[in-house]
């Protein structure tokens, strides 16, 4: 987890910078998800996760480093809060509303749900809640940084509990035809 802690520190300092060096480009959503899974493969394999992807893929305009950071934090949280699940899984699915100007990526796990009393605060700086087996490792910065990075990239982040346990994080991207300023 040391790499993840260092990444959080670097992104925290980057978010406070006056000039942000984002590089917006056309990205395959599922391709980027697969790359984030690959970057976290050891962590996922040690926890016994199975990974599923929907067949549909879409292109979005975003900053790859920023999006990879967001996905890495979400994956890390799924592993942290896997609970006693003997068959943990992550499901990446995409929804494109034809009459909407948005594309949504949902990342669903079947780990520990977030207590309803904690849900309103999960994106607050320093909030750790009282769930999970790695409580002593929680900094309360991961989802805070995810929210800040997502705001910078014009991505909306929503987190909700699943009815059968676990959580779903939904990233909603604006539909943009080409990178900004081009």
Briefly describe each language-model feature range.
Residues 17-22, 55, 59-63:
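Conserved micro-motifs of the catalytic ATP-binding
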Residues 23-38:
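A conserved beta-strand-to-alpha-helix junction within the catalytic ATP-binding
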Residues 43-52:
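Short conserved segments within the C-terminal catalytic ATPase subdomain
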Residues 78-82:
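Short helix-loop "hinge" at the ATP-lid/N-box region of the Bergerat-fold HATPase_c
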Residues 109:
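Acidic ATP/Mg2+-coordinating residue in the GHKL
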Residues 114-126:
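Short conserved segment of the HATPase_c
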């Amino acid at each position: 987890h040391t790499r993840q802690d260092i990444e959080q520190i670097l992104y925290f300092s980057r978010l406070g910078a006056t000039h942000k060096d984002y590089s917006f480009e056309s990205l395959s959503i599922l391709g980027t998800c697969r790359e984030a899974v690959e970057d976290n493969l050891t962590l996922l394999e040690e926890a016994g996760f199975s990974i599923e992807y929907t067949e549909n893929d879409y292109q979005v305009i975003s900053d790859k480093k920023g999006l990879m950071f967001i996905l890495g934090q979400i994956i890390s949280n799924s592993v942290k809060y896997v609970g006693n699940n003997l068959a943990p899984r992550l499901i990446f699915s995409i929804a494109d509303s034809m009459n909407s100007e948005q594309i949504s990526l949902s990342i669903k796990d079947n780990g520990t749900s977030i207590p309803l009393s904690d849900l309103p605060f999960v994106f607050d700086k320093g909030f750790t809640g009282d769930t999970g087996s790695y409580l002593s490792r929680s900094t309360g910065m991961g989802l805070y940084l995810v929210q800040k990075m997502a705001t910078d990239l014009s991505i909306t982040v929503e987190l909700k509990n699943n009815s059968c346990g676990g959580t779903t994080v939904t990233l909603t991207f604006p539909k943009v035809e080409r990178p900004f300023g081009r």
